[in-house]
Amino acid sequence: MKYVLNIVAITFLSINISGCVKSLLAEEFNKFEMTLTDDKRCFLSNGLPNHKTGKFPKKSNPNSISHQKIDVCVSRYPKKVSTNTKITGIMGIALNGILFRPSTAGFWDPNAPRNHSRNGDKNWSVDIFGLKGKLGLDFNNAHVGRGGMYHYHGLPTSLVNKSNKSLVGYAGDGFEIHYLPKKMSGWVLKKGLRKSGPIGNYDGTYNEDYYYIGNNNELDECNGGLLNGKYVYFITENYPKVPRCLYGEVSNDFNKSRH
């Protein structure tokens, strides 16, 4: 069985003319294909969204959206295991072929101009939603990596608004990703001052500013829970928004670093 979706994507692009940056509305084509085999669910995408985006490049995100070659497969019949796998790169793929990459490549670095860098203290990883300017995230909670890849860090607002179903995509272990507005994670912000690392209150700048207390056991620490009797992941309005760990066997295709 094979599904092929070719959807027109309207994106804002920017060009530089005589030193002035101007914006124009350009029409690009989103190409996304999902194929089912006996045991795998595979995706092909050119990385272009099927909805409007923010303006890129810009001061807070100097990268331009460009075509990508995304070719990934996950298990068609995922199984939940007893321990989870921490995700620091690609977590999943949306139903329009755009990847979910909730983490950043930034860590606390007191010697860096913005107090964080790629070579900082790995014990304190930056959460994009805790940063001023959010590294240029647009209204879809997405921005562009150095390689031109447009990717989601949170709820893909325009994609969700175009659909009347809760299914948003698939995780790297094959489980479904859903969004239901009332779902809340069991993660909360710590109180008081940090005992080490960056000086100051726990304010959400770093992922380590949060801890998991559970939410009446509805969602686990990976934002996973039951929907109609089956285990799925949820995107939530509160931290971590997009799951940072997975409870199934993660496909090797999702271990590749994409920035």
Features from the language model and the residues they span:
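Solvent-exposed N-terminal domain segments of exported/luminal and surface proteins
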Residues: 21-134
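Long, compositionally biased interface segments
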Residues: 200-259
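Short, flexible domain-boundary/linker segments around small modular repeats
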Residues: 104-141, 186-221
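Extracellular structured ligand-interaction cores
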Residues: 69-71, 90, 137, 147-151, ...
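Hydrophobic h-region of N-terminal signal peptides that target proteins for export
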Residues: 9-18
